[in-house]
């Protein structure tokens, strides 16, 4: 590629769910979060998704998922006011660019009044690498920019490009039971975006086929490796009453509809489709990517991810509990999340520990994880 693609270089989250302060966390082309259940891995992922939702949909819509800001705010950080100013905001700080030095710095503080009757974006600022910035004032004035609307929603120029990056992030929490069912086809034009649950995978594949037949054929050929007994796998359309898209697998002398396919097959197909898309999202975030997958399929997906990030076409963030998957990665691609003595999530880079770096010469990351060495080093 002639031009290096922008990526999410760092993130810091405060007062969101389990997180009091994540501190600034550097992200690479591939970053994999590991840790015990309840450690706080998902809180960081959900914070990124919530930030995207505020930028795209506004604060009210973003908080509907949590049934109100009071439920998603860290429980130990109640909204208070001092001298007429709100304290303990929920805060997001991100750096997006081709490198940390050449990044646009995004800052957003979200808060509510003490009675939880109103919520608002208390402060927001986007600072370009050249120093030029746009800002939403701390003081809230009636008739000013809508209290729940991000300044990135209508940003132009360099800030507009960063806003496009945020809008294009792809979060996946695949639900195979929904992915196999027929869904209404998108007929208004424009690019088809894969739903978070993967439910519109058939329509997504039809769009890929339209954009780049070679990319589509490559996905089908790769699926033949996953399903060696299958002759073909195609998205189909039905228009008996409503035009709907669905998947159909050709096997021997009969055809199998998408809702009869295995959960692993559907998950692999969706992940391949996102990674092989002719215009992939700048950031792909997948929680517990190993769910429903056999070791061979996990190995295939890790190779696909490695190819994509090395080519610079996308950036990938994963969470996993699979030691086998970890054995396929490098130590510097991992972030361990563990609770400290106060019960607060802390984010550790195992590769920063000299002792672990030595152990990694003899043991793969998955082995170090199951041995407890990663958690010991984080204490």
Per-segment meaning from a language model:
Residues 1-6, 300-379:
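C-terminal lobe/lid and adjacent interdomain/linker elements of RecA-like ASCE P-loop ATPase modules
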Residues 1-20:
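N-terminal pre-Walker A segment at the start of P-loop NTPase domains
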Residues 33:
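Hydrophobic anchor at the beta1->P-loop junction of P-loop NTPases
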Residues 36:
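P-loop (Walker A) phosphate-binding loop of NTP-binding proteins
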Residues 41:
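Conserved lysine of the Walker
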Residues 46-113:
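Conserved P-loop NTP-binding catalytic core
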Residues 91-93, 97-221, 225:
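Electropositive, glycine-dotted interaction segments
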Residues 221-276, 283-296:
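Conserved ABC ATPase signature
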């Amino acid at each position: 590629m002639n031009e290096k693609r922008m990526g999410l270089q760092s993130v810091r989250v405060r007062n969101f769910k389990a997180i009091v302060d994540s501190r600034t966390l550097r992200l690479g082309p591939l970053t994999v979060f590991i840790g015990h259940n309840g450690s706080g891995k998902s809180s960081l992922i959900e914070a990124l998704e919530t930030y995207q939702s505020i930028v795209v949909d506004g604060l009210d819509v973003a908080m509907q998922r949590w049934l109100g800001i009071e439920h998603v705010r860290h429980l130990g950080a109640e909204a208070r006011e001092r001298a007429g100013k709100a304290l303990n905001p929920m805060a997001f700080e991100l750096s997006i660019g081709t490198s940390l030095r050449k990044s646009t710095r995004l800052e957003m503080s979200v808060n509510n009044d003490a009675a939880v009757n109103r919520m608002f974006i208390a402060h927001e600022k986007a600072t370009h690498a050249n120093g030029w910035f746009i800002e939403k004032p701390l003081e809230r004035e009636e008739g000013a920019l809508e209290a729940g609307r991000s300044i990135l929603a209508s940003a132009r120029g360099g800030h507009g490009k960063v806003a496009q990056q945020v809008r294009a992030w792809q979060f996946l929490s695949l639900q195979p039971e929904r992915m196999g069912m027929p869904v209404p086809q998108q007929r208004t034009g424009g690019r088809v975006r894969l739903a978070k649950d993967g439910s519109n995978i058939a329509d997504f594949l039809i769009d890929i086929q339209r954009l780049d037949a070679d990319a589509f054929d490559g996905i089908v050929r790769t699926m033949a490796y996953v399903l060696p007994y299958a002759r073909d796998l195609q998205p189909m359309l039905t228009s008996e009453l409503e035009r709907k898209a669905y998947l159909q697998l050709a096997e021997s002398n009969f055809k199998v509809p998408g809702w009869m396919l295995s959960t692993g097959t559907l998950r692999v197909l969706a992940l391949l489709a996102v990674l092989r898309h002719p215009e992939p999202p700048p950031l792909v975030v997948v929680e517990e990517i190993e769910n429903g997958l056999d070791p061979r399929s996990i190995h295939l997906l890790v190779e696909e991810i490695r190819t994509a990030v090395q080519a610079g076409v996308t950036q990938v963030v994963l969470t996993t509990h699979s030691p086998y998957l970890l054995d396929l990665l490098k130590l510097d691609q991992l972030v361990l999340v563990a609770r400290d003595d106060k019960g607060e999530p802390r984010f550790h880079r195992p590769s920063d520990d000299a002792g672990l770096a030595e152990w990694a010469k003899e043991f793969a990351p998955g082995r170090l994880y199951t041995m407890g060495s990663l958690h010991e080093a984080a204490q």
